[in-house]
């Protein structure tokens, strides 16, 4: 939208702002009618992508809100995620631990030293305290079993 405004201003300097915004509205309506712009599809596909990267449900919800997706579509997407996997946050937190080498992936001698730091990393990633604590309390054998299932 910004680029379209800039393009129209440079090519046609006599156009006023009202005409530009009207033109943009017409283009957006046309794209929505032809289903090139679809919030529901965007919400579902972006959520799948974020889950694959290990994002928490809270992080997915906040990301979609910042992108301007309607609350109705966000709730549908979140409910669909919860139906597919009841404890999605747990598995996403495991992926974060594997990627950042924290929690159960650390050496047993260093785990107590880094417990608070690891808890903070998981909290900033959007995981609840209970989920983070459950992940950090796993021993190495349980962690390896869970990773083999993913």
Enumerate the predicted regions with their spans:
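An alpha-helical, amphipathic repeat domain used for nucleic-acid recognition
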Residues: 1-150
């Amino acid at each position: 939208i910004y680029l379209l405004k800039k393009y129209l201003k440079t090519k046609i300097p006599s156009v006023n702002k009202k005409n530009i915004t009207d033109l943009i509205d017409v283009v957006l309506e046309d794209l929505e009618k032809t289903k090139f712009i679809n919030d529901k599809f965007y919400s579902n596909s972006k959520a799948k992508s974020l889950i694959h990267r290990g994002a928490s449900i809270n992080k997915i919800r906040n990301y979609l809100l910042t992108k301007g997706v309607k609350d109705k579509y966000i709730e549908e997407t979140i409910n669909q995620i919860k139906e597919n996997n009841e404890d999605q946050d747990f598995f996403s937190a495991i992926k974060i631990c594997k990627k950042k080498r924290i929690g159960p992936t650390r050496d047993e001698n260093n785990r107590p030293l880094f417990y608070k730091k690891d808890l903070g990393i998981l909290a900033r990633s959007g995981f609840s305290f209970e989920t983070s604590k459950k992940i950090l309390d796993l021993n190495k054998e349980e962690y390896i079993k869970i990773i083999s299932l993913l």
